Swiss-Prot record:
This is Merlin. PROSITE patterns: FERM_1 (PS00660), FERM_2 (PS00661), FERM_3 (PS50057). One of its GO terms (cellular component) is ruffle membrane. Probable regulator of the Hippo/SWH (Sav/Wts/Hpo) signaling pathway, a signaling pathway that plays a pivotal role in tumor suppression by restricting proliferation and promoting apoptosis. Along with WWC1 can synergistically induce the phosphorylation of LATS1 and LATS2 and can probably function in the regulation of the Hippo/SWH (Sav/Wts/Hpo) signaling pathway. May act as a membrane stabilizing protein. May inhibit PI3 kinase by binding to AGAP2 and impairing its stimulating activity. InterPro entries: Band_41_domain (IPR019749), ERM (IPR011174), ERM_C_dom (IPR011259), ERM_FERM_C (IPR041789), ERM_helical (IPR046810), Ez/rad/moesin-like (IPR000798), FERM/acyl-CoA-bd_prot_sf (IPR014352), FERM_2 (IPR035963). Changing residue 117 to I: In sporadic meningioma. It is linked to Schwannomatosis, vestibular: An autosomal dominant neoplasia syndrome characterized by the development of multiple benign nerve sheath tumors called schwannomas, particularly affecting the vestibular nerve. Affected individuals usually present with bilateral vestibular schwannomas but can have schwannomas on other cranial, spinal, and peripheral/cutaneous nerves. Meningiomas are common, whereas 20 to 35% of affected individuals develop intramedullary spinal cord tumors called ependymomas. Keywords: Cell membrane, Cell projection, Cytoplasm, Cytoskeleton, Deafness, Disease variant, Membrane, Nucleus, Phosphoprotein, Tumor suppressor, Ubl conjugation. One of its GO terms (molecular function) is actin binding. GO terms for biological process: actin cytoskeleton organization; cell-cell junction organization; ectoderm development; hippocampus development; lens fiber cell differentiation; MAPK cascade; mesoderm formation; negative regulation of cell migration. Residues 22-311 form the FERM domain.
Amino acid sequence: MAGAIASRMSFSSLKRKQPKTFTVRIVTMDAEMEFNCEMKWKGKDLFDLVCRTLGLRETWFFGLQYTIKDTVAWLKMDKKVLDHDVSKEEPVTFHFLAKFYPENAEEELVQEITQHLFFLQVKKQILDEKIYCPPEASVLLASYAVQAKYGDYDPSVHKRGFLAQEELLPKRVINLYQMTPEMWEERITAWYAEHRGRARDEAEMEYLKIAQDLEMYGVNYFAIRNKKGTELLLGVDALGLHIYDPENRLTPKISFPWNEIRNISYSDKEFTIKPLDKKIDVFKFNSSKLRVNKLILQLCIGNHDLFMRRRKADSLEVQQMKAQAREEKARKQMERQRLAREKQMREEAERTRDELERRLLQMKEEATMANEALMRSEETADLLAEKAQITEEEAKLLAQKAAEAEQEMQRIKATAIRTEEEKRLMEQKVLEAEVLALKMAEESERRAKEADQLKQDLQEAREAERRAKQKLLEIATKPTYPPMNPIPAPLPPDIPSFNLIGDSLSFDFKDTDMKRLSMEIEKEKVEYMEKSKHLQEQLNELKTEIEALKLKERETALDILHNENSDRGGSSKHNTIKKLTLQSAKSRVAFFEEL
């Protein structure tokens, strides 16, 4: 009895110990998430959960990546998660990354979240130098990355040194030139300031449009050997298969677009490619590992499917997504226009306020100056009045002295002088008295004139005082603020109506909206052509400007190859591949075998 109870207890405890779930950590380009997954879950169950959590509908570009012995692998959708060769230590870690790249990012990437994830991944690949980017293009891409993060450039906010902690340029580019971080920031900021008005999603899309023209964008490279044992590189991307020299990952030697390939298969380490034309012999190559062949096959199948899908009509789901994206873009555009109008009106109101404050300050200064002038006039008038009074008193005193002298002269004349000497002395005194009297009279006349002049100056000073008081009165009675026209309230934006019926989404535009949007689209096309030409000129100008600061001895092999391509008038990546496919598939296969 006791033994049976013990066996039941041990069985139940064993049953409790068996886990029903396991923990998974998902690492995206800008976040980490953890999920509890059921033991029976397949790769598709986990992948769908991650996509739902991110709100991502363009799932066909992405996958869950893990590493096996330094080799990249992708989670298979139809296989249990724990049946993969992954670490059994929890949490089991996967990286949510773009597995396949679009041919044209602007046309194919519909959702904003899709664009954002691609932007982050491509930016990291450029900074980690997994994608070669020439120096002048690196500066331009950095300016769009700054616009996406910081918004419009504002000199009062984005002061010198605000990019000091940002990783914006590949280390290879920084080491290639004798330039300080401040010099790089100055050049990045000069372009950043030109991107005013671009929203985050627009700046990120501009980044991708430039990056997708880089030679190594979206290419997965694998070391292979042909029948002769020559070491080569196989490049797999959205356009097809490309064969490279191991020392030159920029320009393929030959290319096979997906529409020329009928079948792809491998056996052990040998890979077989069957061209669409059955008259052409298959061509084979060997890879280093069986696991690598599995990865090559996955990438070939996925890229081929997307290549064919792009050349067919969009599915209903994609059509709905694109319609919804257009509606969302139109709504955001209208919202941005409304905000721009409000911002413009606010700036105008602030300018009007600043002008009024300036005029008020000016009027205050004028009033202060008028008061000071009035005070000086009053002081001058007081001084002149005092001086006139003193002069008048002096004139009276001189007149009194002159009268006394006259009286003295008369008294002397009336006095009888008996002797001739006394008479002569008396005549001399009389003469002196007359001279003194004449001087006194002249001085008195001069003082009188001076008093008259002072009275006239006093009258003028009082007139100046009256004018100063009048001006002060005029300033005081002026209106402080000029009449302002009332600022009209922002008009409500003409937001289109959204009607959701079942799974269908309808979008109604007014005729005026459609005409306006058509005009804006046409205008954007013209502006884009002008900007493209201007952009190339700017890139060439920057390249010339910093060329003198380049340290030639630090150039990498890819730098040298890129410069040689440029010197030969190198064309774009797509044009290069197009030229390589002008030869017949048969001659290209033969060329591959002879490499």
